[in-house]
From Swiss-Prot:
The keyword Transferase does not apply. Acts as a regulator of the microfilament network governing cellularization of the embryo. Determines the timing of a key conformational transition in the cortical microfilament network: the proper coordination of membrane invagination and basal closure of the cells. To do this, bnk possibly physically links neighboring contractile units of the early cycle 14 microfilament network in a manner that prevents basal constriction until the proper stage has been reached. This is Protein bottleneck. Residues 102-142, 185-272 are annotated as: Disordered.
Length: 303
């Protein structure tokens, strides 16, 4: 259907000027009152007066009805051509054109009657043959997949050519696993050969990376690195943790502390920029060790 910007309530309401009764049921049921929306596309619309593109006010008085009656040709001829009907026509014509083109592409150019006669005669005989052909021709899903794989150069499609010796396995992924060189897993251990041993890699391959140095750990946490989160966290004893804690609170700057930490401790509360109070405190609610232990446990579970 053509979509027009008209307000249908207004401009689509037509009185047949002949009927004297203003809102009479007879005029309402007549064909001129069926709105364009309710109409089927394929219905012939030439009988109906067009909706003019210049909107006319709908009749409000008996006098207006009389005037409309005297007007030649059912009112003013529209300024623009009959927009709405024409659009419908065009859509129908387009449909027909498309149909014709598709027929032409399918090689059916003969007039219909001849075609139908031809079809009727040999129809019965080649039915069985067609069925057989269909069974032979119709490609299976795997065929289609393979076809498109050959069509597009994906990593997988070229894979069998690169490594013909691994093609004994039909599973490409496993073949890839077998042929891939061992990766150096990013770990903090000093030599990656030990880290890689669970992958079964050769030590000769990973020897190049043996020079790695583990990243420095903060001094206070180094004692408890291996400790996992447990329901009861051992309380910090005076002997071990207490002394460390005391010296961390002291103002004396030490080498392993970051500059930010030092400045934060040395500045008084009035000087310091106000961070959001709650956010600042929240980081102290969970003791650092516990948090780190929790992260470690998470990592070990995910691995």
């Amino acid at each position: 259907m053509s979509i027009s910007t008209f307000n249908f309530q207004f401009y689509n309401y037509k009185l047949s000027p002949s009927s004297p009764g203003f809102g009479s049921t007879a005029s309402r049921s007549s064909s001129s009152c069926i709105s364009e929306l309710e109409m089927d596309i394929d219905e012939d619309m030439s009988a109906q007066p067009t909706i003019t593109s210049t909107p006319k006010p709908r009749f409000t008085s008996q006098l207006a009805v009389e005037l409309a009656k005297t007007e030649p040709g059912n009112g003013i001829s529209p300024l623009r051509p009959k927009l709405h009907t024409a659009q419908k026509r065009w859509s129908m014509e387009l449909r027909e054109k498309v149909l014709e083109m598709s027929k032409r592409n399918n090689g059916q150019e003969k007039p219909q009657t001849a075609r139908q006669q031809e079809q009727r005669q040999p129809q019965e005989q080649p039915l069985q043959q067609e069925e057989l052909q269909h069974q032979q021709q119709e490609p299976t899903v795997t065929d289609k997949i393979n076809f498109f794989n050959k069509l597009t150069n994906t990593f997988e499609s070229g894979f069998s050519k690169l490594m013909p010796q691994a093609s004994s396995t039909n599973n490409r992924f496993i073949a890839m696993l077998r042929t891939a060189r061992p990766q150096n897993v990013a770990t903090t251990t000093a030599n990656s050969s030990t880290a890689n041993s669970f992958l079964g890699s050769d030590h000769s391959l990973s020897g190049s990376v043996t020079g790695q140095v583990p990243p420095p750990k903060p001094k206070r946490l180094s004692a408890t690195t291996a400790q996992f989160a447990t329901p009861h966290v051992p309380a910090m004893g005076v002997g071990k943790g207490g002394s460390q804690r005391k010296c961390s609170l002291r103002r004396k700057p030490s080498m392993d502390k970051s500059r930010a930490t030092i400045s934060r401790q040395s500045s008084s509360a009035s000087v310091r920029t106000q961070n959001h109070a709650i956010m600042e405190d929240l980081s102290l609610v969970v003791p650092v060790r516990l948090r780190i232990a929790e992260y470690e446990q998470r990592i070990s579970m995910s691995a």
